[in-house]
């Protein structure tokens, strides 16, 4: 089952994130504050996938197995500034950069525990959050993999995301990322 998440789900969501991204436990302290800060954005939206069907929920602990969250992008945020700089370096026109960065939803996170991947949870989570979007564009970053050969890339392509930037790096993470865009929601 899935439902919108709230701040009390944060620790379980962080566990899903660390497992899905194969990050070391010390990443928890690096990401905790930015995640909490994001929950205060007026446009913050999130969904979680849980193991227990609602009808049989008889416990206080319902294991979280998938998460997604995002918010209306702020053209002055750290992430937006990095993406805009990458777009300039890639030769995008200033008017194109402005039109995208002034009206986008930042799909900040979409993760499913590895043992639950391949069952459509990511698709359902992504579909739920996209249905709520009011912005003209959705932007996301995902680690590059050879030949786009993983479930995340297949999901994003299936859901209509196209390349904005490829082999893009962020400070603090040496891995290359694809920056993807979906337009015309």
Functional labels for PLM-detected ranges:
Residues 1, 14-30:
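Helix-loop element at the rim of GNAT/NAT acetyltransferase active sites that forms part
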Residues 2-7:
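Short, small-residue-biased leader/transition segments that mark boundaries at the very start
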Residues 25-57, 69-72, 95-96:
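Active-site rim helix/loop that mediates acceptor-substrate recognition in acyltransferases
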Residues 60-61, 69-109:
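Conserved acyl-donor/pantetheine-binding loop and adjacent beta-alpha core of acyl/acetyltransferases
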Residues 61-66, 151:
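Glycine-rich acetyl-CoA-binding "A-motif" of GNAT/NAT acetyltransferases
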Residues 104-105, 133-145:
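Conserved GNAT acetyl-CoA-binding A-motif
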Residues 116-128:
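Conserved acetyl-CoA pyrophosphate-binding loop and the N-cap/start of the following alpha-helix
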Residues 123-124, 134, 145-168, 172-173:
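Conserved active-site alpha-helix within GNAT-family acetyltransferase domains
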């Amino acid at each position: 089952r899935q439902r919108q998440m709230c701040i009390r789900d944060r620790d379980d969501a962080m566990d899903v994130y660390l497992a899905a991204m194969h990050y070391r436990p010390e990443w928890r302290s690096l990401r905790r504050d930015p995640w909490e800060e994001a929950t205060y954005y007026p446009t913050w939206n999130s969904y979680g996938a849980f193991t227990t069907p609602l009808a049989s929920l008889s416990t206080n602990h319902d294991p979280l197995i998938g998460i997604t969250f995002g918010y209306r992008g702020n053209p002055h945020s750290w992430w937006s500034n990095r993406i805009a700089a990458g777009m300039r370096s890639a030769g995008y026109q200033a008017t194109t950069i402005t039109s995208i960065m002034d009206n986008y939803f930042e799909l900040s996170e979409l993760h499913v525990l590895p043992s639950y991947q391949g069952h459509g949870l990511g698709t359902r989570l992504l579909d739920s959050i996209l249905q709520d979007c009011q912005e003209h564009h959705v932007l996301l970053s995902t680690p590059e993999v050879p030949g786009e050969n993983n479930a995340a890339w297949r999901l994003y392509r299936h859901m209509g995301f196209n390349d904005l930037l490829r082999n893009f790096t962020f400070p603090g993470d040496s891995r290359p990322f694809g920056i993807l865009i979906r337009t015309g929601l």
